[in-house]
A protein has these predicted regions:
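Residues within the DNA-recognition helix of helix-turn-helix
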Residues: 55
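Alpha-helical DNA-recognition elements
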Residues: 58
């Protein structure tokens, strides 16, 4: 393996680690259709607000999502549309296996 492939594998591993929670997969799926505020994610996913916020922090730290102020709220969006495709493919693959 080369240094470049090692770095690519490490980056991919970090991305997959950040996505390795069902609620985070749900958040990414919701954000695939556009920016959402925390309360919109809470309503869509049926999860408590503190838990959604905690998972958003993990996704922000992994640079999967970014936040932009929208009035008194922060609207979260995906940093890269490829992430939505990765998650959609993973969910589709998991459903096929059942």
């Amino acid at each position: 393996m080369t240094m470049d492939s090692d770095n690519g594998y490490m980056a991919a591993g970090e991305l997959l680690k950040a996505l390795a929670a069902p609620l985070r997969i749900g958040i990414v799926t919701e954000l695939a259709s556009g920016p959402r505020c925390v309360h919109e994610l809470v309503d869509a996913l049926g999860a408590p607000q503190p838990l959604v916020s905690q998972h958003l922090r993990v996704l922000r730290g992994a640079q999967v999502v970014r936040g932009a102020r929208r009035g008194r709220e922060i609207a979260y969006s995906l940093t890269d549309e490829h992430i939505a495709h990765i998650v959609a493919d993973a969910v589709s693959h998991a459903r096929e296996g059942r």
